[in-house]
Structures are given as C-alpha cells and as structure tokens.
Amino acid sequence: YAQRPDATACADFDIWNNRMNRYVRRGSKGIALLDESSGYPRLHYVFDVSDTGVRRNSRDPDLWQYNDDLKQPVSDALTAAYGISHERVSQQLADIAGKLVADYWDNNSEDIRAIVDGSFLMDYDSAGLEMQFKSAAAISVTYALLERCGFEPDGYFDKDSFQAIYDFSTPDTVYALGAAVSDISREVLRTVERAVK
C-alpha cells in the first residue's frame, strides 16, 4: 500500500502476460514484495492493472465492489464463516481481524519468537511480544480490509494506532508481519468476494 496506494489489481509480469493476455508497459514501476518462498529473501515485483496495456482477446481483472446494498449478504457470510456479527460491517471486519490474528499467533508464535533477535521486539518478554504482534497485525489487517471494501479507513484510526508496527525493524520480522497480514486479509476478502458475486 505504501508504494502504490492507488493500486487496485496487482499480479506479476507472467500472469499479466500469459493468463490475462495483457502487456506491462515499458518503464512501469513494479511494487516490490519480499519473497522468501525459495528459502532466501528476494524481491518479487507485481504490477497494477494501470501499468498494463490491452491486446486482442485480453482479459480485464474482475474486481468486486462492496456497497451498502450488499451489507446484509456480506455480514451474513462473515457471520457464517467466522461466528462474529455486528450491525456495522466495518466493526465486524475489525472484530474478525482480531480473532484471526489471535488464531494466527497461536499457530505461528514459535516461528515468530525465533526471528526477533536484532529487532526492537527482542526487548519484550513473551507476553509483550504477543501483544505487539497482535496489535500490529490486527490494525494492519483491519486497515487492509476497510480500504479494500471501500470504507474510509482514516476515520477509524489515530496517529498512535500503528505504533506497534515500528518494533518490526528487521527484514525477517517485517516479512513475518507482512505474511500474516497478507494471509489473513486474503482469507477474509475471499469470503466477502463470494458474498458480493
């Protein structure tokens, strides 16, 4: 988000070229993502749809949009999937983010504890580390969900809301936080997408 706040549909070069039959314009600036799937950290670049041009038989990305007419089906789908309901979908998304972050911590806490050396997180005891991770991840997931669903996230947070993120000060800790935020956001947004379509 920080690199390209206006980005709407991102994919790597090969997906735009091969699956979508679109070309990435020369000189386009990619969005750098940290990728450790190969066993060592490297940058992986994705491009927004606005960086692409069309060819014959090219495909447009199918972007869903949330609006107030979809409030009830989206809220019902979220309640069915996560067991959390609220009269305001924005608050329901925030509550779901908190629940899923807690579940993520329960499943991945040992891996996260193993990478805090050298970061500002290493000064925390076990409970403090858990609190910082949950705070940073929950606020980041909530922001991502609200932004994608078209809510104005700036009205939900103040300048101190994102303070916990600054403790993630090494590439490993940033990657761990980013992976958690990405995985959780993707899961919830797919639930919303199914309800919208």
Model-identified regions with their sequence ranges:
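N-terminal accessory/interface modules of nucleic-acid-binding and processing proteins
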Residues: 1-197
